[in-house]
Amino acid sequence: MATDDDSFPWDQDSILSRDLLSASSLQLCYENLNRSCVRSPYSPGSRLILYAVFGFGAVLAVCGNLLVMTSILHFRQLHSPANFLVASLACADLLVGLTVMPFSMVRSVEGCWYFGNTYCKFHSCFEGSFCYSSLFHLCFISLDRYIAVSDPLIYPTRFTASISGKCITFSWLLSIIYSFSLLYTGANEAGLEDLVSALTCVGGCQVAVNQSWVFINFLLFLVPALVMMTVYSKIFLIAKQQAQNIEKMSKQTARASESYKDRVAKRERKAAKTLGIAVAAFLLSWLPYFIDSIIDAFLGFITPTYMYEILVWIVYYNSAMNPLIYAFFYPWFRKAIKLIVTGKILRENSSTINLFPE
């Protein structure tokens, strides 16, 4: 991130001398080109370890989220408005693993961008689009869980497939339009022309964002985050109250309708708890990054490169977390994975298999 504050003088010669210091003794991204960026000074062993760690995250994000999408879209038992939101969220995380993480892996390890200036812009746009899409999906999922837990019997009539589709469309359109309008047009660099010119070298792919847009980015994170925290606080208060009521009723003879309502409420509370953990993981992954963005925007690139890379990869790894959370808490997801990896979903009528034997 960058700043447009005049109190930070950016001199092209001083920055280049800092970044290209002792360039003759260092490896360059492009040895035969002037103004080439300097490669990261990692040893071969360190490079191998970093590639393994980052590559594992990318593979996990792609394979894990592909399993989530396949499970929900294939098995009819999982065809519900809420699960379609989860499948769309998995699609956003899958695209992070496909279009963002592999290229960021090379940039982080080598310190060089070998994929051209055009894809550098697209890479930044994809990064913003898919990550904001995940945020908006999680916000809508939290609202869905609140409705389901607060009144589980009328929930199916309130959160319909039509409403789910509108939430999905909104999440994708807003995130894509915003990210491309900001990053592909270069609006984020307004007022930072001298800084961008000073930092530009062949083999680099850096995104400079002025203070105004950094603040707007932070608000786009903060508002949904506050909504999610508020909603899940209410959900757990309702869940606690329901648990107390069920305990009281267990000492009495309950009518059949009450028993059914209790079972439904219990199922919805469990779903809310699991998705609440996914939301918490998302917020914990993203909050340090946005705080650092604000600090850098107003204090001027004080974050060390290695620390910034750590924060970015914590964000990326969040795209691989949700499938692990589902696998840990959802028996139906574990069963679906087994059916998928063993090839049993290719059998006739496999979509009607019961994933909820209980």
Curated annotation (Swiss-Prot):
One of its GO terms (biological process) is G protein-coupled receptor signaling pathway. It holds the Pfam family 7tm_1. The keyword Transmembrane helix applies. It is a multi-pass membrane protein. It comes from the Eukaryota. Disulfide bonds join 37-201, 120-205. Glycans are attached at residue 34. Its main location: membrane. The chain crosses the membrane at residues 48-68, 84-104, 126-148, 167-187, 212-232, 275-295, 310-332. Residues 69-83, 149-166, 233-274, 333-358 are cytoplasmic. Residues 1-47, 105-125, 188-211, 296-309 are extracellular. Keywords: Cell membrane, Disulfide bond, G-protein coupled receptor, Glycoprotein, Membrane, Receptor, Transducer, Transmembrane, Transmembrane helix. SUPFAM superfamilies: Family A G protein-coupled receptor-like. Olfactory receptor specific for N,N-dimethylalkylamines trace amines. Trace amine compounds are enriched in animal body fluids and act on trace amine-associated receptors (TAARs) to elicit both intraspecific and interspecific innate behaviors. Ligand-binding causes a conformation change that triggers signaling via G(s)-class of G alpha proteins (GNAL or GNAS). Belongs to the G-protein coupled receptor 1 family. In addition to the well known disulfide bond common to G-protein coupled receptor 1 family, trace amine-associated receptors (TAARs) contain an unique disulfide bond (Cys-37-Cys-201) connecting the N-terminus to the extracellular Loop 2 (ECL2), which is required for agonist-induced receptor activation. This is Trace amine-associated receptor 7c. It comes from Rattus norvegicus (Rat).
